[in-house]
């Protein structure tokens, strides 16, 4: 369902990300003692009483600084407010009202969105009431003293907030596809997100490491909803300092795990690097459906054979991910970007697909007829009794055999290829579990599965 949005607004370092973590009940927003740590607007699901909603974590709002990132952060905060049902304006109770708070308050009073004033860092009830009273002067109504770290006062804040939010029953269900956009730094992930959504949703800058959080954007195409997750660029461990980037990379790995499909973005000018190979291995290990997005194709000098040569190189270097579909695009010009979601749809369908035991065993029957299982040096031949799919996402098939050790890697790859070719598992990894089973055990289960 499309959840109502609550924007968290405030100047830098008043505890906005800590409040988001408190409301969302997790530690996803990066909290670290470095100014301006939240750059993009990031969405987190939250719940209170009978209301489901999203809290939007924005960068620290500053109106009088022209350094490179701050104007971009202002734009992101303003966009978050424009799409919100309500906003929480966070101030620092320990410092009292500042000129920056007054400037933000003046701007907020001109907006049509309901504003709730949260006075953070009020660590005691008595002192908090005194601290909060100083903020009446901002002209935004009653100040609510809270402690984001300890949670005190947040219940009263949320009671006020949900007055402005629709109930869960009034929200329509959607079959959402979660898509993580993953790759090395500066391969064009944020530009791709912007091209897919048609707005400057993620900050695009030539500075490496612009995207620090895994940030979400929900887009609709026809009847299908997609949650696009832009992630921080993933570098070699030895190049990552402990701090915000360290946390961001861990967040990117979590984004891979929660995604239905990964858009693995590769720089066409760099080709496949060692770091790309390691990242591809991580995606494959997590069992995620994948689309290989070769970006910056507009910058490549090419002739009529270039794309075929590049495809061969990709298939050679990423041989363990040969099941992934690939597309050559330019996020900068938008060329072929609109076709990416078609591949996402195909990969999702394969990733979620379930096949009956009867069909699986028909494939096995034909496969073993054309190519018999191997025989050991001692003359003992492998035998596949039957197979059954035990789960999807990714599709996982258990094969019951007389002895798993009798099936070498070549034959296992052959069986996997047969499943892919005959059952259409494109864009997703599949898992085959080879399980030993005696003839007597097979006979006891013959009423539950078709034997081969």
From Swiss-Prot:
GTP 2 binds at residues 183-190, 230-234, 295-298. SMART domains: AAA. Residues 353-438 form the KH-like domain. Pfam families: KH_dom-like (PF14714), MMR_HSR1 (PF01926). Residues 4-169, 177-352 form the EngA-type G domain. PROSITE patterns: G_ENGA. It comes from the Bacteria. Gene3D superfamilies: 3.30.300.20, P-loop containing nucleotide triphosphate hydrolases. One of its GO terms (biological process) is ribosome biogenesis. One of its GO terms (molecular function) is GTP binding. Keywords: GTP-binding, Nucleotide-binding, Repeat, Ribosome biogenesis. Belongs to the TRAFAC class TrmE-Era-EngA-EngB-Septin-like GTPase superfamily. EngA (Der) GTPase family. PANTHER family: GTPASE DER. GTPase that plays an essential role in the late steps of ribosome biogenesis. Associates with the 50S ribosomal subunit. This is GTPase Der. The gene is der.
């Amino acid at each position: 369902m499309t959840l109502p949005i609550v924007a968290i607004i405030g100047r830098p370092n008043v505890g906005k990300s800590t409040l988001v973590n408190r409301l969302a009940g997790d530690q996803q927003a990066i909290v670290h003692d470095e100014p301006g740590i939240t750059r993009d607007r990031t969405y987190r699901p939250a719940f209170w009483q009978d209301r489901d909603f999203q809290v939007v974590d924005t960068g620290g709002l500053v109106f009088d600084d022209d350094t490179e990132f701050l104007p971009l952060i202002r734009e992101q905060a303003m966009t978050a407010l424009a799409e919100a049902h309500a906003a929480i304006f966070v101030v620092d109770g320990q410092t009292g009202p500042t000129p920056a708070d007054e400037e933000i308050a003046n701007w907020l009073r001109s907006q049509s969105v309901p504003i709730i004033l949260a006075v953070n860092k009020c660590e005691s009830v008595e002192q908090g009431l005194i601290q909060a009273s100083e903020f009446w002067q901002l002209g935004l109504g009653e100040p609510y003293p809270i402690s984001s770290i300890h949670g005190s006062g947040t219940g009263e804040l949320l009671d006020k907030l949900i007055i402005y939010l629709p109930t869960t029953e009034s929200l329509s269900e959607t079959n959402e596809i979660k898509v993580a956009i993953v790759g090395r730094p500066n391969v064009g992930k944020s530009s791709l997100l912007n091209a897919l959504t048609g707005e400057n949703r993620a900050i695009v800058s030539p500075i490496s490491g612009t995207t620090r959080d895994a940030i979400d954007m929900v887009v609709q195409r026809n009847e299908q909803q997609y949650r696009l997750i832009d992630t921080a660029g993933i570098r070699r461990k030895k190049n990552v300092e402990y701090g915000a980037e360290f946390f961001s990379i861990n967040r990117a790995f979590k984004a891979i795990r929660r995604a239905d499909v990964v858009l693995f973005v590769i720089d066409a000018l760099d080709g496949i690097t060692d770091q790309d190979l390691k990242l591809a291995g991580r995606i494959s290990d997590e069992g995620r459906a994948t689309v290989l997005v070769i970006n910056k194709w507009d910058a490549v000098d090419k002739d009529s054979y270039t794309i075929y040569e590049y495809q061969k190189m990709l298939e050679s270097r990423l041989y363990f991910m040969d099941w992934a579909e690939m597309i050559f695009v330019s996020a900068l010009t938008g060329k072929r970007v609109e076709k990416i979601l078609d591949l996402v749809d195909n990969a999702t369908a394969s990733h979620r697909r379930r096949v009956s035991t009867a069909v699986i065993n028909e494939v096995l029957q034909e496969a073993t007829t054309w190519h018999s299982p191997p025989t050991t040096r001692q003359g003992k031949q492998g035998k596949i009794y039957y197979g059954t799919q035990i789960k999807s996402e990714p599709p996982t098939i258990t094969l019951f055999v007389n002895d798993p050790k009798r099936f070498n890697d070549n034959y296992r790859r052959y069986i996997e290829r047969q499943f892919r070719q005959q059952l259409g598992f494109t864009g997703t990894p599949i898992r085959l579990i080879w399980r030993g089973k005696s003839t007597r055990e097979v006979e006891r289960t013959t009423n539950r599965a078709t034997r081969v």
